[in-house]
Amino acid sequence: MTIESTNSFVVPSDTELIDVTPLGSTKLFQPIKVGNNVLPQRIAYVPTTRFRASKDHIPSDLQLNYYNARSQYPGTLIITEATFASERGGIDLHVPGIYNDAQAKSWKKINEAIHGNGSFSSVQLWYLGRVANAKDLKDSGLPLIAPSAVYWDENSEKLAKEAGNELRALTEEEIDHIVEVEYPNAAKHALEAGFDYVEIHGAHGYLLDQFLNLASNKRTDKYGCGSIENRARLLLRVVDKLIEVVGANRLALRLSPWASFQGMEIEGEEIHSYILQQLQQRADNGQQLAYISLVEPRVTGIYDVSLKDQQGRSNEFAYKIWKGNFIRAGNYTYDAPEFKTLINDLKNDRTIIGFSRFFTSNPDLVEKLKLGKPLNYYNREEFYKYYNYGYNSYDESEKQVIGKPLA
């Protein structure tokens, strides 16, 4: 199979440019140890959902070219797009999974390209919960499940009722199955696929975050009752189980303390401090995670947050609790070309900076940041399409090209 060159990606001539001051002499380009690996610089591509897998959730040739291009700068940490941990976890078309052999074999080809470029990979395990597509689940004989039967908005309730697949609360037996079977199965396939790290998606209003959040968790059992310990129980059970499967030094977690995306209420420091305390206790006993990824208060899901609404919100509290590595991500280009916030947030030796949207339009983002070359502004209109246009190419003919399974 032919892998396209990075140089084949040419954006439209009217694309807006963002000026960049060279960052090659900053801490961004100093090494950092993450688990058992030493990354030569501190830039990560954090997950961007793009819908370019095959319709049956197998990674495609389009994704192979995409991740190969974005891992060309040696030592880049590529955290692949949110990836379904099980069929029950989500069934949206063209979203990749990591729960069967064909998916693992396809991801392995992508990882071989990433590793061949001298870079590193992490897979983000995704479980949708109440924000899943009720009709698609119904068509596959699967339920729409969540911590509690609380819809995230009126439209999602309407669609679920029309599909005849109304939202219901998970039973404790189903929760046990998620912890003991579904997540471990995905993690084992991730190891078979050659991923360096496995990241648990605990952010942005998806299932694990739904348990954390009072807006979505109305349970009256050991996973609810309003208490922090109960609401965090499922997340920490998943962490502990996957430590057994992949090892703590290959495991990671993503959190979004300040997000109000998909019907969530901002939980802020309290419950996230508890989670970090629990993870630090595990680290003190020799089970330190590879990294914790934090979403900055500048963004909530796919939306930017106004400066006014960011006031009083910061992820600095996390450094006082967790002593391991952090990835921090969320609109770090807002103060370009100087990148003063980025430089300030690198003041310690435990931080990696994540970029997402600008990686979509700049396969060579790492080199551009190092040398101070202008960045192409991203085109969100093409983020969630199935074809190759706006993904690996801007040739109009690529609107007819859909990804083919790699295995």
From Swiss-Prot:
One biological process term from GO is: steroid metabolic process
Q: What induces or represses its expression, per the UniProt entry?
A: Induced by estrogen (17beta-estradiol).
**Result of knocking out the encoding gene:** Decreases phagocytosis of the fungus by host cells. Increases expression of GPD2.
- Write out the GO cellular component annotations: cell surface; fungal-type vacuole; hyphal cell wall
Q: Which CDD domains match?
A: OYE_like_FMN
Source organism's superkingdom? Eukaryota
Which intervals of the chain form a coiled coil? none
Reactions catalysed, semicolon-separated, are: A + NADPH + H(+) = AH2 + NADP(+)
Cofactor(s) recorded for this entry are: FMN
Similarity annotation: Belongs to the NADH:flavin oxidoreductase/NADH oxidase family.
Q: What does this protein do?
A: Oxidoreductase that binds mammalian estrogens with high affinity.
What is this protein's record name?
Answer: Probable NADPH dehydrogenase
